[in-house]
Design a protein with these regions (language model features):
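Ferredoxin-type iron-sulfur electron-transfer modules in oxidoreductases and energy-metabolism complexes
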Residues: 20-38, 59-92, 109-136, 264-265
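Glycine-rich dinucleotide-binding loop and its adjacent helix/turn
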Residues: 122-138, 196-216, 241-303, 411-421, ...
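A conserved FAD-binding loop/helix module that cradles the flavin
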Residues: 436-464
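FAD-site-proximal beta/loop scaffold in flavoenzymes
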Residues: 250-281, 366-440
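Rossmann-like dinucleotide-binding cores of NAD(P)H-dependent redox enzymes
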Residues: 169, 173-203, 207-208, 297-344
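Local cysteine-cluster metal-coordination motifs and their immediate loop/turn environment
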Residues: 41-63, 85-108
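Feature captures the FAD/FMN-dependent oxidoreductase FAD-binding
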Residues: 75, 138, 143-147, 195-246, ...
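N-terminal Rossmann-like FAD-binding beta1-loop-alpha1 element of flavoenzymes
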Residues: 142-168, 293-301
Length: 464
């Protein structure tokens, strides 16, 4: 097979920025089969597979890409499916540039192979062309409960179901999917794709119980006692938003990004018929620089805002959001106000947001995170007229589970403490992973934690 030595990736077709910033349809349109084969031939099949070491779920990347290069897309899917329960999701939202693609040998001198784009293509091809029912393993007679139907919980459920466990997933919201459903907008991750991944788990025998708030409706003790689950995996995420504690945060027109995106993505609060309408003004300031901030800003634009600012206390080079998301936001007209930080949100006479006062920042010495610490420049305050402020400053785990589970150790941030990478907690038979352990992180890292915990749960139950 001839290699493709083009130094750059095959470009991803996308909607025109001036069209897509007014709709919620997917921005990236996906590769054609010809594009996928051409991109796959850029892989030089290194012996030590550095790309695979960068994948939290351990997909054999050179093997699946080799099948794509040969045009055998179903074989490629089967390779991915051995390790990942959510390939169509990962191909869209994983930060490949800091994981698999970040370790790609081609990336040393040129652009890395478009691993994420190829994973997405393979998953989409399989969904559109293969309609056989999944093989349901024979039951091994054991029961496991999963708390939370986000990426960690779904991955653990899928891996355990493949081993013959009877798995029930308890989800607090009225739909399964967790952050994949409520946090990531349709234009980045269509909800129909998430639902199809969940439907695949249902066909494997996984049960989903929605509107079940564990810690309120049932406790972990009840699941392991009265309901006779032999192990419990806690993948309840981190949905408690953080705020700055500045004057004006309680004004009407101030939202957490979590609330703004949940009401937009899940509750369709922007529709005129909504029972819980969301007020999106004409001038919006989004405070923060991560992927969630980009999602909130780009959603606000699509909901009718005329001007949307990203307000971030460090510089453009320090933005934690994916490079692709920043580029898409810039293309769509989002204005980046970097090296500045809010100090007050100002009200109008009716208690609504009227403006936001910020102070300019400069970068000092590196802090504990390794990034240069932002320092205020005295006397540099300025005010911007805005009528909506969205705070995207991170999230922490909800305290409900830890407060109703005696003996479950948590740290000062409210995250569940686990041993090593296996997710074992201080309670016997209780495992945890994803944002409930790490705080807000990436989808693929949560999936990796769910996968590791599923393996540990299997070993625990089989050793009893």
């Amino acid at each position: 097979m001839a290699f493709n030595m083009d130094p750059k990736k095959c470009p991803m077709p996308t909607q025109d920025p001036n069209v897509r910033n007014k709709n919620f349809e997917e921005v990236a349109l996906g590769y054609t089969a010809e594009m996928a084969v051409n991109e796959a031939k850029r892989c030089i099949h290194c012996k030590n597979k550095p790309c695979q070491t960068g994948c939290p779920v351990g997909i054999d990347i050179p093997e699946f890409i080799g099948h794509v290069a040969e045009g055998d897309f179903e074989a490629a899917y089967q390779v991915i499916n051995r390790s990942s329960s959510l390939p169509a999701v990962c191909g869209r939202v994983c930060p490949q540039e800091s994981q698999c693609e970040g370790k790609c040998t081609r990336g040393i001198k040129n652009e890395p192979v478009g691993i994420g784009r190829l994973e997405r293509f393979v998953a989409d091809w399989h969904r559109e062309n293969v309609h056989t029912a999944p093989i349901v393993p024979a039951s091994n007679g054991h029961k496991v409960a999963i708390i939370g139907a986000g990426p960690a919980g779904l991955t653990a459920a899928g891996d355990l179901a493949k081993l013959g466990y009877k798995v029930t997933v308890y989800e607090a919201l009225h739909v399964a999917g967790g952050v994949l459903m409520y946090g990531i907008p349709e234009f980045r991750l269509p909800k129909a794709i998430v639902q199809q991944e969940i439907d695949g788990l249902k066909k494997m025998g996984v049960d989903f119980e929605c509107n079940m708030v564990i810690g309120k409706v049932l406790t972990i003790d009840e699941l392991m006692g009265e309901y006779r689950y032999e192990a419990v995996f806690v993948g309840s995420g981190a949905g408690l938003p953080r705020f700055m504690g500045i004057p004006g945060e309680s004004l009407k027109g101030v939202y957490s990004a979590n609330e703004f995106l949940t009401r937009s993505n899940l509750m369709k609060a922007y529709l005129p018929t909504s029972k819980t309408p969301i007020r999106t003004g004409k001038k919006v300031a989004v405070v923060g620089g991560g992927n969630v901030a980009m999602d909130a800003a780009r959603s606000a634009l699509r909901l009718g805002a005329e001007t949307v600012y990203i307000v971030y206390r460090r510089g453009m080079a320090e933005l934690p959001a994916r490079k692709e998301e920043v580029e898409h936001a810039e293309e769509e007209g989002i204005i980046f106000k970097t090296l500045c930080n809010p100090v007050e949100i100002l009200p109008d006479e009716n208690g609504f947001v009227k403006a936001i006062t910020c102070i300019e920042m400069e970068l000092g010495e590196p802090d504990a995170s390794g990034r240069r610490r932002p320092i205020e420049k005295k006397g540099s305050e300025f005010t911007m007229d805005v009528d909506t402020v969205i705070m995207s400053l991170g999230t922490s785990p909800n305290p409900l589970i830890r407060s109703t589970t005696p003996g479950l150790e948590t740290n000062k941030h409210g995250c569940i403490v686990t041993e090593g990478d296996e997710g074992k907690t201080s309670r016997e038979g209780v495992y945890a992973g994803g944002d409930a352990v790490t705080g807000a992180a990436t989808v693929i890292k949560a999936m990796g934690a769910g996968k590791a915990a599923a393996k540990a749960i299997d070993e625990y139950i089989q050793s009893k």
